[in-house]
């Protein structure tokens, strides 16, 4: 059960499960299904199996079930990884972070159901779950990198790219928070057309300000990632890990911008909105991978 041969498929399945947790949370918010089980948690309308199953109850129950299964899968993964590849420096802290933030995510979700938190607190939920996802994602990448197909262990990242990548990570996380706030504040269609309502640029409500703030953050995110991408491919042309990694990040942010624009143009089409959540999830995951490589470079400086 905890054999080393299970590591790769466990990593893939756990990463996919965490992806479904992210998408499930976005689906709950987008469809207004957060109250699908009333104010009961972990029960649903005070029962293990509710008497009626309207669509919002099905969505909320499904999200809870996937979250519970993902916790079990992540526990299985981290125990196996700790046992067999715990000698790799990042495995143990990533294991603790992945489980810890997954539990914290569940507690915040439960608090939101029971005590009805305000939008600014609820917006933290997606960001916290994103940290848990990224930790699982990194464990999986480490498992596959043991084969050293891309020689990532020998990669040395210089200070200019390190600074840009740290800035990129911080800006992305701020953008994630504002995006989650847009969903929770029901501001997806606020502040007129995209990219700006040129006929009336002045925000007139809190929702307008939330939406405008997110658009500004999205523009900053795109700009920083584009600058970082150009720097990376220009200065590391022969390193496949950097070249492919930052290229993938740039493609993901382009897709993120496109789906963000289409969400507004289509009056928040659900499929497009879920792709919007998917792209930012993997963009942040890629960014945390760059940070892990950077920290290895910092350690090599000290040796």
UniProtKB/Swiss-Prot annotation:
Spans traversing the lipid bilayer: 9-29, 68-88, 94-114, 126-146, 164-184, 216-236, 245-265, 271-291
All ranges on the Cytoplasmic side of the membrane: 1-8, 89-93, 147-163, 237-244, 292-303
Residues bound to heme o: 63, 125
GO BP terms in the entry: heme A biosynthetic process
Its membrane topology: Multi-pass membrane protein
Disulfide bonds: 37-44
GO cellular component, one term: plasma membrane
Cofactor or coenzyme needed: heme b
Residues engaged in binding heme b: 214, 276
Topological region Extracellular: 30-67, 115-125, 185-215, 266-270
Enzyme Commission identifier(s): 1.17.99.9
Pathway involvement of the protein, from the record: Porphyrin-containing compound metabolism; heme A biosynthesis; heme A from heme O: step 1/1
Recorded catalytic activity of this chain's protein: Fe(II)-heme o + 2 A + H2O = Fe(II)-heme a + 2 AH2
Source taxon at top rank: Bacteria
Keyword Iron attached: yes
Keywords: Cell membrane, Disulfide bond, Heme biosynthesis, Iron, Membrane, Metal-binding, Oxidoreductase, Transmembrane, Transmembrane helix
Active site location: 60
Alphabetized GO MF terms: metal ion binding; oxidoreductase activity, acting on NAD(P)H, heme protein as acceptor
Compartments in which it is found: Cell membrane
Similarity comment text for this entry: Belongs to the COX15/CtaA family. Type 1 subfamily.
PANTHER family referenced in this protein's UniProt entry, alphabetically: HEME A SYNTHASE
Subunit structure, interactors included: Interacts with CtaB.
Domain note: The N-half (TM1-TM4) and C-half (TM5-TM8) domains are connected by an intracellular loop. Each domain is formed from four-helix bundles and they align in a pseudo twofold symmetry manner. The N-half domain is the substrate-heme O binding domain and the C-half domain is the cofactor heme B binding domain.
Function: Catalyzes the conversion of heme O to heme A by two successive hydroxylations of the methyl group at C8. The first hydroxylation forms heme I, the second hydroxylation results in an unstable dihydroxymethyl group, which spontaneously dehydrates, resulting in the formyl group of heme A.
Protein known as: Heme A synthase
